């Protein structure tokens, strides 16, 4: 009987060790995928210091001296907290939800493409003032900075492939 118990104990110990390692790995990767709200971000496109404070609910408060820097920080913060939502809304405006979620979104995609929301939005840019375009560019620069940070901090995985 002890010949049977010893292999069972070894198997149980190996199973426990493997399970523990998997849990540690998943925890590590999950924690590393969350944004670090306490780090300093440096970018040459920011003209003056910008401070982003988060309250106990992680709601950001941006303090800066220029509108461009504020919009840069806003883009960065949005990409930190809402990147998935931003990508999903972009896919929605392009009428490409069925590429992600399957055939049940084909009718929705057809309607969106018929309304041509994406191209109409792109065409509306020519009616914006130079000041507004500069602010939107600052916002986009903030998003792109966050995407670059994700890529560089990807633990060798690179940027996440969302679709």
Kindly label every feature range from the protein language model.
Residues 4-42:
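N-terminal type II signal-anchor transmembrane helix
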Residues 30-33, 37-44, 48-50, 57-163:
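Flexible, non-catalytic peripheral segments of proteins
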